[in-house]
């Protein structure tokens, strides 16, 4: 809704995306590793977001994974209960620019030496 987008605009730059999904972790329902009590909420939210992006692409939509947002503002504006933690935002819509072709990687790709450390 317009009201929801106005609330999100207080927390992040979403550049007019028509649809934004707030991906949250539910700490009351999260799986916990028994050895060290680690919750896998960030991992689970990442997998979920990735799958939603793949499906959005399949449906002809553009998507943008947004981590640059203020979770405190999202929590307050949407009155999220304490057990829900906003992990990321997923903006969806039709792209307003042309897609770049795969040939761009020949000139724009970071070299392997800059990405990988050998020891």
Residue ranges of predicted features:
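Small-aliphatic-rich amphipathic alpha-helix that forms the alpha element of a beta-alpha
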Residues: 21, 36-77
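Glycine/small-residue-rich phosphate/adenosyl-binding loop
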Residues: 1-45
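C-terminal helix-cap and adjacent tail motif
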Residues: 88-119
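Short active-site-adjacent structural elements
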Residues: 31, 73-76, 97-101
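Short secondary-structure boundary segments
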Residues: 25, 68, 94
